[in-house]
């Protein structure tokens, strides 16, 4: 972990150095480029002070390739003349016949002032951009310095050995490390010396050295980051699949499913349960209409058949809409399950952080509260009254996805699944909880009796 952290910090420092060096070179070049363009923007003043031999030498393009490097004035003049000719002037067939007056007329006083104003605006704009970039680079450098200081204090504390062991144990779950999320694990493995003794000695040593305040501050920040990351991740797991599936159901799936079902499908019911319900409701409607006819003592058989037909059409429309909703529920459940699976697979490290945070909360409770919550969960799922709750839950799920309600299947599920849960829970108590905290097990058995 230390090696990967040091490598990452080194890469960030190296990138920061390269960026600063590049900005320095660009600033130097931009500053001197505008100065040279302004200083030598009128090469006629240089040309008038040249000798006839030099004038004849610079009139040819070959001088650019054979110029004397020791003659800086001639070099500057020819370079600027050649540059302005390439970017602003048209080429003639004969370079020797090019009139210098066309070149020199460009560099009058007005163009000189305009170029000066443009250069000042350009440099002020670039300076603002450089100031923003320098502020960002300074922020990055300050963050790296804070990271180095925190790392120094963290690894110098005697009690930080326990926290480092937690980090190493949790980060061994994955191959890579997320530096943005501080991760810890809630408990350590069982050693020969009880960890309560080592923890007390470490805290006593920290009090003697005078590092307790910094240690408490660091643990508080670590717990804060862990809690925020866990709550954020659990919020995504709970609300993001529901939010995406609801939007896709309303705006994407529902119009297409309705069009497909009403145009391509000729059936109304998906299963026999809907047919039985529709037939039962139709019989009830007919009985009510016949009862009204008998009470009123009127013979309107034609009106009665029309009313029965209207009620039948209404029932057909109702159960047709129910069939569409069943298909939509099935598709949205598949979308929600897919999104939830993707979030769990992508956020394995955040899931480990959430797991450690939940375990930390659980272990921070007293033994009585731990036993109370264990009893509450066990009685809720595998207790005496749990079969009725399981029947309601399974029936609602079957109705939601469009399956027929079968009491024999539900009874078989209720008679087997809670037994499996009870076996798994007892194994967890025997295997894990009994070693972790025997006092919780004793309190649990006492309250259960």
Swiss-Prot record:
- Kindly report the protein's main subcellular placement as a broad class: plastid
GO cellular component entries? chloroplast inner membrane
Q: How does it sit in the membrane?
A: Multi-pass membrane protein
The record's catalysed reaction(s) read: K(+)(in) + H(+)(out) = K(+)(out) + H(+)(in)
A Pfam family name for this chain? Answer: CemA
Its annotated compartments are: Plastid, Chloroplast inner membrane
| MF terms (GO), sorted A to Z | antiporter activity; proton transmembrane transporter activity
A single GO BP annotation from the record? potassium ion transport
Transmembrane stretches, by residue range? 9-29, 227-247, 326-346, 374-394, 410-430
Question: Which keywords fit this entry according to its UniProt record?
Answer: Antiport, Chloroplast, Hydrogen ion transport, Ion transport, Membrane, Plastid, Plastid inner membrane, Potassium, Potassium transport, Transmembrane, Transmembrane helix, Transport
Q: Which family does it belong to?
A: Belongs to the CemA family.
What is known about what this protein does?
Answer: Contributes to K(+)/H(+) antiport activity by supporting proton efflux to control proton extrusion and homeostasis in chloroplasts in a light-dependent manner to modulate photosynthesis. Prevents excessive induction of non-photochemical quenching (NPQ) under continuous-light conditions. Indirectly promotes efficient inorganic carbon uptake into chloroplasts.
Q: What is the name attached to this protein's record?
A: Potassium/proton antiporter CemA
């Amino acid at each position: 972990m230390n090696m990967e952290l040091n490598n990452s910090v080194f890469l960030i420092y190296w990138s920061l150095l390269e960026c600063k060096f590049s900005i320095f070179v660009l600033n130097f070049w931009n500053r001197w480029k505008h100065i040279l363009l302004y200083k030598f923007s009128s090469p006629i003043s240089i040309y008038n002070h040249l000798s006839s031999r030099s004038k004849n030498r610079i009139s040819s393009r070959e001088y650019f390739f054979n110029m004397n490097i020791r003659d800086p004035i001639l070099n500057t003049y020819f370079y600027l003349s050649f540059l302005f000719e390439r970017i602003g002037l048209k080429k003639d067939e004969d370079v020797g016949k090019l009139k210098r007056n066309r070149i020199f007329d460009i560099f009058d006083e007005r163009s000189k002032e305009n170029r000066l104003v443009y250069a000042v605006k350009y440099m002020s704009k670039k300076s603002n951009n450089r100031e923003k970039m320098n502020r960002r680079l300074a922020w990055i450098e300050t963050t790296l310095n804070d990271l180095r200081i925190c790392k120094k204090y963290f690894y110098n504390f005697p009690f930080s050995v326990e926290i480092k062991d937690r980090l190493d144990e949790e980060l061994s779950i994955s191959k890579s490390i997320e530096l943005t999320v501080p991760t810890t694990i809630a408990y350590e493995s069982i050693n020969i010396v009880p960890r309560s003794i080592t923890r007390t000695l470490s805290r006593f040593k920290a009090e003697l050295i005078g590092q307790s305040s910094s240690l408490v501050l660091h643990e508080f920040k670590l717990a804060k980051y862990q809690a925020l990351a866990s709550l954020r991740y659990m919020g995504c797991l709970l609300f993001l699949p529901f939010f995406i599936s609801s939007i896709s159901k309303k705006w994407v799936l529902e119009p297409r499913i309705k069009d497909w079902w009403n145009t391509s499908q000729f059936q109304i019911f998906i299963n026999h349960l809907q047919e039985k319900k529709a037939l039962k409701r139709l019989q009830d409607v007919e009985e009510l209409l016949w009862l009204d006819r008998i009470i009123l003592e009127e013979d309107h058989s034609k009106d009665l058949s029309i009313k029965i037909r209207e009620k039948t059409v209404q029932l057909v429309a109702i159960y047709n809409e129910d069939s569409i909703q069943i298909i939509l529920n099935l598709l949205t459940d598949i979308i929600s399950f897919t999104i939830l699976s993707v979030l769990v697979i992508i956020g394995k490290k955040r899931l480990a952080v959430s797991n450690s945070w939940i375990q930390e909360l659980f272990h921070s409770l007293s033994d009585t509260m731990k036993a109370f919550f264990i009893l509450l969960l066990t009685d809720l799922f595998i207790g005496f009254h749990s079969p009725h709750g399981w029947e309601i839950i399974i029936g609602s799920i079957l109705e939601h996805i469009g399956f027929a309600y079968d009491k024999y299947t539900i009874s078989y599920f209720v008679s087997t699944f809670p037994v499996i849960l009870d076996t798994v829970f007892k194994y967890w108590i025997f295997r894990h909880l009994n070693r972790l905290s025997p006092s919780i097990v004793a309190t649990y058995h006492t309250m259960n009796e």
